[in-house]
Amino acid sequence: MTIKLAIDCMGGDHGVAVTIPAAIQFLAAHEDVEMLLVGQPDVIAAELKRLHATAHSRIHVVAASEVVSMDDPVEVALRKKKDSSMRVAIKQVKDGAAQACVSAGNTGALMAVSRYVLKTLDGIDRPAIATAIPNEKGAGTTVLDLGANADCEPAHLLQFAQMASAMVSVVEHKPRPTVGLLNIGEEVIKGNEVVKQAGELLRASDLNFFGNVEGNDIFKGTTDIVVCDGFVGNVALKSTEGLAKMIGAMLREEFSRSWFTKLLAIVALPVLTRFKRRVDHRRYNGAALLGLRGLVIKSHGSADAYAFEWAIKRAYDAAANGVIARIAQAFESHHDPAGAAVPLSTSAPAADAA
């Protein structure tokens, strides 16, 4: 089966200088993939020429005249830039021309445009942003929400857990992934009212609910999935990235203090290389916008080509494993323990993550 991926080539801090090299590199390793490169044709053509890829048979250029910048407000992306590379790429998914879209554009605009174009799946009130964070077990812990919903109701956290469970079950081939609820302690009496009520809903659900988990459990890999509101999740994600960069900077500083430490660095290079690979945040780039009627993957705006290629891989894996269909199936017959559908707010806040 051929997987067709729509790439928002103009999005992010670096545009085609990152997105197109990453797409070509991914194509070289995956013969079952076709790329729809969306953006300004002359800019895309120039980059393809530079990379000697103008005649690539599995590359198709889709024209889009506008670009959503990293600081464009949501209303500009929605109402004014209707021919943006972001919107046109998402529309490829809606129209069935592509099975997934990858964009490094600004998160608020991407979530708003994706929701407007694709709509949400039946039974889902609010889409959420989910990605894997490195853990000591090596597989990564899937954490959501990472910034789409700063304020949540208990039922929203239950929905996030259901969506993530559906995704992890097919992508990681774990039929019953474990779910943890991020809290300030393991005890059921801990946390604010939203978290405590969410815990009750999760315990009453048919999910494989582990219970409350703390921040350190994300890195231990205590559960496959950790659920929280978007405010907490975004802080956790940015803290993780900052910590990884700080550790790297400290190691470089310590190993460069003297000729002796520089020699030690050479001796330890194989170990340091393996360590860097395990904690390299670029390998975990690519967050899924879960809950939509199509697959959209958000890359970091500052991603380099290596990181963006990993975001493409996330899209490929999710598309190949039918994540959207699996999530839709999970919500077809979901009811609370009393037999009534779980009540959900109809409010829909704008995405908060930067």
UniProtKB/Swiss-Prot annotation:
EC main group: transferase
Pathways involved: Lipid metabolism; phospholipid metabolism
Catalytic activity: a fatty acyl-[ACP] + phosphate = an acyl phosphate + holo-[ACP]
Enzyme Commission no: 2.3.1.274
Biological processes per GO annotation: fatty acid biosynthetic process; phospholipid biosynthetic process
GO MF annotations in UniProt: phosphate:acyl-[acyl carrier protein] acyltransferase activity
GO cellular component, one term: cytoplasm
Subcellular location: Cytoplasm
InterPro entries: FA_synthesis (IPR003664), Phospholipid_synth_PlsX-like (IPR012281)
Gene3D superfamilies per record: Isopropylmalate Dehydrogenase
Record key words, sorted: Cytoplasm, Lipid biosynthesis, Lipid metabolism, Phospholipid biosynthesis, Phospholipid metabolism, Transferase
Ranges that cross the membrane: none
SUPFAM superfamilies noted in UniProt: Isocitrate/Isopropylmalate dehydrogenase-like (SSF53659)
Family: Belongs to the PlsX family.
NCBIfam families according to UniProt: plsX
HAMAP family assigned to the protein according to its UniProt record, in alphabetical order: PlsX
Function in brief: Catalyzes the reversible formation of acyl-phosphate (acyl-PO(4)) from acyl-[acyl-carrier-protein] (acyl-ACP). This enzyme utilizes acyl-ACP as fatty acyl donor, but not acyl-CoA.
Quaternary structure and partners: Homodimer. Probably interacts with PlsY.
Protein name: Phosphate acyltransferase
UniProt organism field: Ralstonia nicotianae (strain ATCC BAA-1114 / GMI1000)
Lineage start: Bacteria, Pseudomonadati, Pseudomonadota, Betaproteobacteria, Burkholderiales
Gene: plsX
